[in-house]
């Protein structure tokens, strides 16, 4: 803005933004209408995470009037909006990178976070939100067959049981025999699973691992013995021999297996 003053004697004075004392008062700023831009970095939408105190991270930028840091906020689920010093703000080009870590652990299950901010001209950014899941509990796993310590003469062994995870299903199950490779079991929609393996002669160690979608796992082991060799009768002794009628006779048998 330029101001010109002229008196009756036709003397003229001019003042504009370059004036040494009045310059700042002659600067007219027009408010901008472009809102800040928000972007959530972590967690991502539909993420499945095992940390129940996740570091929620997002950015807010505004290249015009600038981001007003006092308006930066985050809301978790239906809780109150969190603002102020609870949110860490690191200056970046045109705005801030923000981080908030909950002081109280979030429960397992689904959560929604919402972030918002405004610029110095009062333009509010379009709120951004993401929904994610937290899973800190490994899946349940039971092996119903075979029992630990089971002895059999059949090489084919059907390993079976049940598994479940309320937060991050489906659950995958693998079965490993001794030092062999872990092989996938068939898991039904109700959580029951089974896998047929071939035992080797002697003591076998069966390792079953259930892993949920969050990568948490539960392990159960069973020891099973395969014995296909019949016992050997090495000797039989009858004492006394011969024996009188209606008398007691002792039969001694030596057997190895």
Residue ranges and their predicted role:
Residues 46-52, 148-155, 241-247:
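Short, solvent-exposed loop/linker segments at the N-terminal edge
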Residues 96-100, 191-195:
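Short strand-edge motifs at loop-to-beta-strand transitions and within beta-strands
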Residues 7, 18-39, 128-139, 222-231:
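Flexible, low-complexity linkers/stalks enriched in Thr/Pro that connect modular domains
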